[in-house]
């Protein structure tokens, strides 16, 4: 304590205060300078010289950044060793991180940003792969390469892989790679990918008879809720899909929903900017969307399986950007920001592992705010006694049983995954 705080106190009183706070003050987190020095190791200045104006470019990660990717793969494998999923449904999605850094490039929405592309494992609630990118890099740029890297990071115990992606994944090489079984490890990869609604797509949808459109209710428990949406399969065959009679089958599923307020005359083009619409013969205006798949499920089941990804990608990116501070980029250096994002991915998977393996199923869906409230921000005392670490809480604290149960599960994890 400072002299001003102990002024006019007796020596015995000052001695009591010193003994009360005799532990020296130490940093609980690294200093900003140490953090910046650490993050600078992930930046490769030579890659910046390879950039070309107005062209999409992804810097090659250096050894340090690749090392974080290997650590993440090891963590995914550790969690998989305990939960044992045989199937991996991979959801690929990109997100925009708005920033005001001068080094950042403009995204398609017109502001400076970075745009990471993330591969999320739905069954395991883990991020398998996430590539940090500039804001001007399209979401579908080199998506096949990212998919192959994600497949390489999956644990050996995974036997089957399926893919879901928005319209950014509607790429010939990506779809053919999955449908033709080009992957040496997993073979044919079942997928459902959003389709860009082109004039040809609208033309095929307009040719369908009304009897071909099937209702698409929403399933709520054991009940079906009417949505007004309908689905139908199209006979659309793009040129690149029809080169061989022995090629894989691609199914195009269209979903339409009537517009509650049809566009005014001459305003149709403005409506196209927000959502694809089309006018059905003698039926009025509809919102129209499309999905391409190689799965053999019924069309309505394909739509529901595809829509299961909706919202989850935004939630995952929301946790990364807000809960784990991945969206608070610390530097103007691309590599430093990429390292910061990779650390946020590690924190996401660590948080998911703790919830699944230590806290229990009822905690899997809870955000980090709930975990902080119940487990982290607790008033207590940490005591070292007889070479043991003790945590003392208030008597009857509601989090006490949860902490004890989590501690026992963590100790059990030290003995390795259960033997099959």
Region spans (language model):
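An anionic, glycine-rich sequence signature occurring as long contiguous blocks
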Residues: 187-322, 408-420
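Electropositive, glycine- and tryptophan-enriched low-complexity nucleic-acid-binding patches
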Residues: 107-157
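Short amphipathic alpha-helical "interface-anchor" segments enriched in bulky aromatics
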Residues: 302-339, 343-354
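Active-site-proximal, Lys/Arg-enriched surface segment
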Residues: 17-118
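A short, flexible helix-boundary coil/loop motif
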Residues: 350-420
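Short acidic, glycine/serine/threonine-rich loops at helix termini
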Residues: 100-105, 128-132, 172-180, 202-208
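Short, conserved catalytic/metal-binding motifs centered on acidic residues
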Residues: 1, 7-20, 24-27, 31, ...
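Domain-level cores of phosphate- or acyl-group-handling catalytic modules
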Residues: 138-200
């Amino acid at each position: 304590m400072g002299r001003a705080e102990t002024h006019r106190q007796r020596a015995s009183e000052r001695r009591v205060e010193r003994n009360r706070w005799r532990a020296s003050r130490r940093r609980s987190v690294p200093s900003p300078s140490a953090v910046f020095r650490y993050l600078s190791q992930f930046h490769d200045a030579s890659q910046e010289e390879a950039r070309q104006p107005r062209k999409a470019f992804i810097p090659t990660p250096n050894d340090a950044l690749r090392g974080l990717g290997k650590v993440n793969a090891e963590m995914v494998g550790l969690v998989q060793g305990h939960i044992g999923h045989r199937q991996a449904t991979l959801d690929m999605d990109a997100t925009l991180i708005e920033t005001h850094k001068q080094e950042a490039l403009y995204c398609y929405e017109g502001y400076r940003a970075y745009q990471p592309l993330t591969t999320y494992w739905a069954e395991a609630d883990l991020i398998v792969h996430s590539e940090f990118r500039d804001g001007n890099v399209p979401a579908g740029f080199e998506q096949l390469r990212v998919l192959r890297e994600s497949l390489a990071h999956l644990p050996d115990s995974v036997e089957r892989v399926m893919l879901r992606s928005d319209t950014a994944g509607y790429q010939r090489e990506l779809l053919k790679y999955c449908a033709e079984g080009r992957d040496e490890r997993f073979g044919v990869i079942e997928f459902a990918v959003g389709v860009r609604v082109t004039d040809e797509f609208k033309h095929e949808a307009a040719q369908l008879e009304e009897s071909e459109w099937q209702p698409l209710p929403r399933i709520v428990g054991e009940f079906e809720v009417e949505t007004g949406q309908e689905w139908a399969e199209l006979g659309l065959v793009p040129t690149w899909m029809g080169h061989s009679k022995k090629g894989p089958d691609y199914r195009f599923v269209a979903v339409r929903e009537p517009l509650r307020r049809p566009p005014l005359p001459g305003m149709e083009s403005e409506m196209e900017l927000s959502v694809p619409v089309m006018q059905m013969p003698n039926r009025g205006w509809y919102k129209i969307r499309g999905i391409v798949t190689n799965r053999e499920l019924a069309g309505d089941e394909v739509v529901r399986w595809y829509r299961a990804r909706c919202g989850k990608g935004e939630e995952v990116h929301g946790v990364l950007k807000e809960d784990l501070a991945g969206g608070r980029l610390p530097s103007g250096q691309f590599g430093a920001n990429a390292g910061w994002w990779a650390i946020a991915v590690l924190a996401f998977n660590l948080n998911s592992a703790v919830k699944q393996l230590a806290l229990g199923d009822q905690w899997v869906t809870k955000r980090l705010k709930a975990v902080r409230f119940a487990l982290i921000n607790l008033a207590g005392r940490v005591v070292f006694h007889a070479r043991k670490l003790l945590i003392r809480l208030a008597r009857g604290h509601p989090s006490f049983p949860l902490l004890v149960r989590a501690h026992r599960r963590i100790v059990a994890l030290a003995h390795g995954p259960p033997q099959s």
